[in-house]
Curated annotation (Swiss-Prot):
Pathway: Lipid metabolism; oxylipin biosynthesis. Residues 42-171 form the PLAT domain. Monomer. This is Linoleate 9S-lipoxygenase. It is found in: Cytoplasm. Its cofactor is Fe cation. It comes from Lens culinaris. The lineage of its organism: Eukaryota, Viridiplantae, Streptophyta, Embryophyta, Tracheophyta.
Length: 866
C-alpha cells in the first residue's frame, strides 16, 4: 500500500538517535574538578558535567543538524546516487521503548519522490558551534517496497568545518565490492579514501584517519638521556607490528623518535563512547597510574620502619588489615569513587585490596610443586609449555655469540624422580615438558644483572604423572660467564626438596622461574601477542574494507577499544620508566626484548590447534573431536580453548561461505586483496618476506585468517588477561622481579635463608613498593566493564546486517557458546580432573564465555578492550 500512496512531494519519516556530548565527554571527564583528574571524572561526576557545550536536546533543533538521503538505486548524470533535499531534526521523541540509556531520539522528514528509488546512504552535517555529538542510528519507516531501513552509525559527529568531506553513513545492508549497487560505488570508494588520509600532518582530535607508524614514541629523550628508547619496527634487528600514526613532531635529541603528549591521537570513533561512567576503565587505568600509584609509593617510602614485607602474613595483610595511610594522603584519594571500586577501606584509614582467588581457600597451597606446575597449563600464561623432544635440551641461540647453551640438566638429575621410567622412555611416551625461559632472556641477562635486579635464564623440566598432573623434576638457573658471552652460561641445577634449607632453596628456584614467566607473560603473551599484533589488522580493515563489506562487519566487534587501550599503554604502561619497566624484571629492555621475540611470530600458528601441535602438546588426530589429541589430557586451557576455537571457526565458516560462493570470489574481491596486501606488507611489514603468510586466494585461507584473528582478540586475550589479579594479586605466587641471586652455601645469605626463609624469599622477589603498584594496575586490567561486549554478542543487536542467514548463524554461535559454558562447568565439577582446580581449589574459569562486571576471573569479551 505504501508504494501506491508514495508519489511526488511525499515525505519519508525517520528517527535519529544520538547521545549528547556531555554524556560521553572524555575531555570533560579528564578536566573534572576532582582530587584525581580522570578517576574522579570516570566515577561519578559525569552527571555533574551538565553539558558545558550542549545544555539541552533543544540545541539539536532548528537548522543545527542537516541530513540528506542518497539513493542506492537511482543515479544522477554523473552515475552517483541521487541526493535528496536537506532535512533537519525536528521534535524530541520520548515514547520509544527501545531507547537506550542517555540516548535522545528526534524525528526527521525527508522529501523523497518515488523516482528517487530506495535510500542506501545519507549525509549528515553538524552546524552547532563547537559541539560534537555521538550519532547512534537513523531509521527510515515505511519506505516504498522496502518497509524499514536502518543505519547503524555509532560515530562522533563534529562541526562540519572540521571535515574536508561530508560525513556519510550506509544502510545496514552488506555488499561485496562487486555487488555494490552502482549508484553507491563512488560513495563507498570516497569514504575509504577519506579514512586513509594522505599520510601527512599531525592528526587532530576530530580526525578519522587510520595510518601506520613504528613504535618510536616510548621514550622521552628530550626530557633526559636515560629515557631514550630504541625504535621498534622498521628494522630486521628490532621488528614490530605497526601502531596507529599520530603525526606528532619528532624529538630534538633523537630525530627518529616521536615526541610524547598526554593525549594520544586515535581515529575519533576508536575512543568509543561508554554510557556508564564506571565503564571508563581505560581512563581509570591512566589515573591509577598517574595519581594513586605515586601516592602509595610515597607512603611506603616514608614508612622507614616498614619499607619491606617481612613475613608472608605481611603480604596477606594487604587484603585483611590493609595499608595504613597518613591523613593527608587519605584525604587526597579517599574522595575518589575509584577508591571504593579498587579497594575496601571499611571506613578505616587503610587501603585493602580484594583477596586474590589463589589464596581464598588455602593460604599456602601456592607453594606446592603441583600448583607450580599446574599454573603452566591452567594459570595466566598457559600456552608456553612445550614437549621435550630430545635430551639434553638444546638452545637456538647463536653459539658464536653466546657459546654452548645446551642444558646442564642430565638424566642423573631426572631419573631418580621418574618412578622407574628412563628419560628416553619418558620422551618416547610424551611425558616430559618444559616452560623454557632460557633463550628469550639470556642475551639480555648481563645488562639486566648490571642493574638493581638480579636474575637467571631458566629451564624447568616437568613430568606427566599417571594421575594426569605435572611434577617438576629439575630447574636450571643460568648466568652469563664472567669472561664473556661467548664462553656460554654458568649453570646450576636444582632438584625438588621438601625439608630444611633445601626446601627453601627449591622454593626460591621456582620463584626465579615464575619471575621469568611473569615477564614473558606480560610483554609477550599478553602485550605483543594480543594487543600489539591486532592493531595493524584494525588499521588495514578501516583503510580498505568498507563498512558495508562482509568481512568488515564480521571483524568489527573484535576491534572495540583496542587502539584506545594500546595508546594508553604506550603512554603509561610500556613507555620508558612506565609501570612495566618499573615493576618487572626486564626493566628498560622490556619492549626491546619483546621485539626480539616477535621475529619468531607466525600468524598461522596463533590459531589454537596449530599452536598446540607446534608446541608438541597435541598431535593431529582426525578421530578426536577437534582434529587434535592432547598429550596432556587434563590441560584446562587447551581443552576449553578447543571448544571455543571450534565454535568460532564454525561461525566464521558459515559466514564466509554465505558471501563468497567460490574461491574465485576471494581473488576477485579488490577491497579484501588490498586489505590483506597492506596488512602483510605494511602493518606487519617487518615479516612481509615470511613464506607462511596466507596468499588469500581461497575461502579456506580467509576462514582460517578470520578465525585466528577473532581467537586472538577474544579467547586468547581473555585467557592471558583476566586471571592477572586472581593469580598474580598474591605477589608471592607470581613475583615480577628478583633482586638477589640464589644464596650459596657458606655465605651469610644462606644462613639467613636457613633461619627465616619467608624473609629471605621476600627480600629476593618484588619489593613492597612495586607490589602495590603492580596490584593496583593488574586489578584494573583484570576487571570487566558493565557494558562489556562478550563473544556471541553485538552492540548493534540484530541491526548489524539485513541478511537473515548470517543473522541466524550468529544466533547459533551464541547458543553454542552457552552450551560450551555448561560443558566447562561440568568439567570443573569432575574431581578426577585434578588440574582444573589444583591444590589451591581454584577452578579454571578463564574461558567461560560469559561474565558479570568486575573482578570475576571469567568471561570472553569480543575484543581487547582493557
Amino acid at each position: 500500500m505504501a508504494s501506491l500512496l508514495f508519489g511526488r512531494g511525499q515525505k519519508l519519516k525517520g528517527t535519529v538517535i544520538l547521545m549528547q556530548k556531555n554524556v560521553l565527554d572524555i575531555n570533560a571527564l579528564t578536566a573534572a574538578q576532582s582530587p584525581s583528574g580522570i578517576i574522579g571524572g570516570a566515577f561519578g561526576v559525569v552527571g555533574s558535567i551538565a553539558g558545558s557545550i550542549i545544555d539541552t536536546a533543544t540545541a539539536f533543533l532548528g537548522r543545527s543538524v542537516r541530513l540528506r538521503l542518497i539513493s542506492a538505486t537511482v543515479a544522477d548524470a554523473s552515475g552517483k546516487g541521487k541526493v535528496s533535499k536537506e532535512a533537519f531534526l525536528e521534535g524530541l521523541l520520548t515514547s520509544i521503548p527501545t531507547l537506550g540509556d542517555k540516548q535522545s531520539a528526534f524525528s526527521v522528514h525527508f522529501e523523497w519522490d518515488s523516482n528517487m528509488g530506495t535510500p542506501g546512504a545519507f549525509y549528515i552535517e553538524n552546524f552547532m558551534q563547537g559541539g560534537e555529538f555521538f550519532l547512534v542510528s537513523l531509521t527510515l519507516d515505511d519506505v516504498p517496497n522496502v518497509g524499514s531501513i536502518k543505519f547503524a552509525c555509532n560515530s562522533w559527529i563534529y562541526n562540519d568545518k572540521k571535515y574536508q568531506s561530508d560525513r556519510i553513513f550506509f544502510a545496514n545492508k552488506t555488499y561485496l565490492p562487486s555487488a555494490t549497487p552502482a549508484p553507491l560505488v563512488s560513495y563507498r570508494q570516497e569514504e575509504l579514501k577519506t579514512l586513509r588520509g594522505d599520510g601527512t600532518g599531525e592528526r587532530q582530535e576530530w580526525d578519522r584517519i587510520y595510518d601506520y607508524d613504528v613504535y618510536n614514541d616510548l621514550g622521552a629523550p628530550d626530557q633526559k638521556a636515560t629515557l631514550g628508547r630504541p625504535v621498534l619496527g622498521g628494522s630486521s634487528t628490532l621488528p614490530y607490528p605497526r601502531r596507529g600514526r599520530t603525526g606528532r613532531k619528532k624529538t630534538v635529541k633523537e630525530p627518529q623518535s616521536e615526541s610524547r603528549s598526554d593525549t594520544v591521537y586515535l581515529p575519533r570513533d576508536e575512543a568509543f563512547g561508554h554510557v556508564k561512567s564506571s565503564d571508563f576503565l581505560v581512563y581509570i587505568l591512566k589515573s591509577a597510574s598517574q595519581n594513586i600509584v605515586p601516592q602509595l609509593r610515597s607512603v611506603v617510602t616514608l614508612q622507614l620502619n616498614n619499607p619491606e614485607f617481612n613475613t608472608f602474613e605481611d603480604v596477606r595483610s594487604l587484603y585483611d588489615g590493609g595499608i595504613k595511610l597518613p591523613t593527608d594522603v587519605l584525604s587526597k584519594i579517599s574522595p575518589i569513587p575509584l577508591f571504593s571500586e579498587l579497594f575496601r577501606s571499611d571506613g578505616e584509614a587503610a587501603l585493602k585490596f580484594p583477596p586474590p582467588k589463589v589464596i581464598q581457600v588455602d593460604h599456602s597451597a601456592w607453594m606446592t610443586d603441583e600448583e607450580f606446575a599446574r599454573e603452566m597449563i591452567a594459570g595466566v600464561n598457559p600456552h608456553i609449555i612445550k614437549e621435550v623432544l630430545s635430551f639434553p635440551i638444546k638452545s637456538k641461540l647463536d653459539s658464536q655469540l653466546y657459546g654452548d647453551n645446551t642444558s646442564k640438566i642430565t638424566k642423573e638429575h631426572l631419573e631418580p624422580n621418574l618412578g622407574g621410567v628412563t628419560v628416553e622412555g619418558a620422551i618416547q611416551t610424551n611425558r616430559l615438558f618444559t616452560p623454557d625461559h632460557h633463550d628469550a632472556l639470556f642475551p639480555y641477562l648481563r645488562k639486566i644483572n648490571a642493574t638493581a635486579t638480579k636474575a637467571y635464564a631458566t629451564r624447568t623440566v616437568l613430568f606427566l604423572q599417571d594421575n594426569g598432573t605435572l611434577k617438576p623434576l629439575a630447574i636450571e638457573l643460568s648466568t652469563p660467564h664472567p669472561d664473556g658471552d661467548s664462553f656460554g652460561p654458568v649453570s646450576k641445577v636444582y632438584l625438588p626438596a621438601s625439608e630444611g634449607v633445601e626446601a627453601s632453596i627449591w622454593l626460591l628456584a621456582k620463584a626465579f622461574v615464575v619471575v621469568n614467566d611473569s615477564c614473558y607473560h606480560q610483554l609477550v603473551s599478553h602485550w605483543l601477542n594480543t594487543h600489539a599484533v591486532v592493531e595493524p589488522f584494525i588499521i588495514a580493515t578501516n583503510r580498505h574494507l568498507s563498512v558495508v563489506h562482509p568481512i568488515h562487519k564480521l571483524l568489527l566487534p573484535h576491534y572495540r577499544d583496542t587502539m584506545n587501550i594500546n595508546a594508553l599503554a604506550r603512554n603509561v604502561l610500556v613507555n620508558a620508566e612506565g609501570i612495566i619497566e618499573s615493576t618487572f624484571l626486564w626493566g628498560n629492555y622490556a619492549m626491546e626484548m619483546s621485539a626480539v621475540v616477535y621475529k619468531d611470530w607466525v600468524f598461522p600458528d596463533q590459531g589454537l590447534p596449530n599452536d598446540l601441535i607446534k608446541r608438541g602438546v597435541a598431535v593431529k588426530d582426525p578421530s578426536s573431536p577437534h582434529g587434535v589429541r592432547l598429550l596432556i589430557e587434563d590441560y584446562p586451557y587447551a581443552s576449553d580453548g578447543l571448544e571455543i576455537w571450534a565454535a568460532i571457526k564454525s561461525w566464521v565458516e558459515e559466514y564466509v561461505n554465505f558471501y563468497y560462493k567460490s574461491d574465485a570470489a576471494i581473488a576477485q574481491d579488490a577491497e579484501l586483496q588490498a586489505f590483506w596486501k597492506e596488512l602483510v606488507e605494511v602493518g606487519h611489514g617487518d615479516l612481509k618476506s615470511a613464506t607462511w603468510w596466507f596468499k588469500m586466494q581461497n575461502r579456506k585461507e580467509l576462514i582460517e585468517a578470520c578465525s585466528i584473528l577473532i581467537w586472538i582478540a577474544s579467547a586468547l586475550h581473555a585467557a592471558v588477561n583476566f586471571g592477572q589479579y586472581p593469580y598474580g594479586g598474591y605477589i608471592l605466587n607470581r613475583p615480577t622481579k628478583s633482586r638477589k641471586f640464589m644464596p650459596e652455601k657458606g655465605t651469610p645469605e644462606y644462613d639467613d635463608l636457613a633461619k627465616n626463609y619467608e624473609k629471605a624469599y621476600l627480600r629476593t622477589i618484588t619489593p613492597k613498593n612495586d607490589t602495590l603498584t603492580d596490584l593496583t594496575i593488574i586489578e584494573v586490567l583484570s576487571r570487566h566493564a558493565s557494558d562489556e561486549q562478550y563473544l556471541g554478542e553485538r552492540i548493534e543487536g540484530d541491526d548489524w546486517t539485513t541478511d537473515s542467514v548470517p543473522k541466524e548463524a550468529f544466533k547459533r554461535f551464541g547458543k553454542k557458546l552457552a552450551e560450551i559454558e555448561e560443558k566447562l562447568t561440568q568439567r570443573n565439577n569432575d574431581e578426577s580432573l585434578r588440574n582444573r582446580y589444583g591444590p589451591v581449589k581454584m577452578p579454571y574459569t578463564l574461558l567461560y564465555p560469559s561474565s558479570e562486571e568486575g573482578l570475576t576471573c571469567r568471561g570472553i569479551p569480543n575484543s581487547i578492550s582493557i
